[in-house]
């Protein structure tokens, strides 16, 4: 079945690719038959070759300002709407919806994924019912870590908005990410919530993970930027909020809460149970904080805890202990 033809009119389109100016000649698609919500005679977007848009299925480029070229592939029932650009080997299939977005450089988008007002670039795989919206940027790059072949992936029911996800990061499950910068091999999954704002993004990098029902939330004050680095993890029902930096071998789990700041945890730190850390606190070198333990630095004060130590039960610490008391 031939569902469209190419108009005879040629259109030249110029664009920048990695700093190089390129141009391509495009022809407009014209529907030949009625299918889905498209009627015969309807003009659509512009492509450089018939191989770009499949003659099978209900896939269609709806907007006359939308472009697809340079080895791109649009198949199945995929829809491309508004002024979108699909180029350079990008593969769009199944029931994907691309709306005012740019997809390029071998990105693969499948199943029921929605991309709105965002950029997807590089070798990555988006699948399931994932959503990328709100001016987000997904920039994949392999070969920057020991896992050279790992693809950046976003899948299941994950939602990303107003964020940048780059390199080889993995976002999946029912994770929700808003105003965040996630890079390297970081992972956010399960029902995790990563919530920044217009003032401050959340930063998750290296091999850090956020999962379970954990929440990582930025504040609106200056430097109220939660930062997860190296192998740090926030899990279960834990909450990390504000100016908190988690570094080597840190796990915050249970119903633990970190808030205020500046808080820094480094070198084999475990915070779990219903433990609470508030204010300007530095915790380092093999410390476990569990149970109902409460560590709080009041305004103008700072607490420094250095292990090895175990702080548990209902212990309450409001100042740096004298050596040997803990």
Model-derived features: positions:
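Extended, highly charged clamp/arch subdomains and adjacent linkers
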Residues: 84
């Amino acid at each position: 079945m031939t569902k469209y033809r190419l108009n005879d009119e040629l259109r030249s389109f110029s664009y920048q690719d990695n700093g190089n100016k390129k141009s391509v000649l495009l022809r407009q698609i014209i529907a030949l038959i009625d299918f889905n919500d498209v009627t015969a005679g309807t003009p659509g977007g512009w492509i450089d070759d018939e191989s770009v848009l499949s003659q099978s299925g209900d896939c269609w480029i709806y907007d006359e300002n939308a472009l697809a070229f340079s080895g791109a592939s649009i198949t199945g029932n995929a829809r491309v709407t508004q002024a979108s650009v699909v180029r350079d080997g990008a593969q769009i299939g199944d029931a994907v919806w691309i709306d005012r977005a740019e997809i390029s450089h071998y990105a693969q988008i499948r199943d029921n994924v929605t991309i709105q007002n965002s950029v997807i670039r590089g070798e990555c795989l988006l699948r399931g019912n994932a959503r990328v919206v709100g001016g987000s940027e997904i920039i994949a790059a392999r070969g920057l870590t020991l896992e050279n072949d790992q693809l950046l992936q976003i899948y299941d029911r994950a939602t990303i908005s107003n964020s940048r996800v780059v390199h080889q990061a993995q976002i999946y499950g029912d994770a929700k990410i808003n105003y965040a910068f996630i890079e390297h091999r970081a992972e956010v999954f399960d029902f995790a919530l990563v919530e920044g704002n217009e003032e401050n993004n959340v930063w998750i990098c290296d091999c850090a993970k956020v999962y379970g029902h954990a929440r990582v939330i930025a504040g609106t004050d200056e430097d109220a930027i939660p930062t997860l680095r190296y192998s740090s993890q926030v899990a279960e029902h834990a909450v990390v909020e504000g100016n908190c930096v988690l570094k080597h071998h840190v796990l915050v789990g249970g119903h633990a809460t970190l808030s205020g700041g500046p808080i820094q945890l480094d070198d084999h730190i475990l915070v779990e149970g219903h433990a609470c850390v508030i204010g300007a606190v530095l915790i380092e070198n093999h410390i476990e904080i569990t149970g109902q333990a409460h560590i709080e630095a009041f305004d103008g004060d700072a607490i420094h805890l250095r292990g090895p130590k175990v702080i548990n039960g209902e212990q309450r610490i409001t100042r740096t202990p004298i050596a040997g008391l803990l």
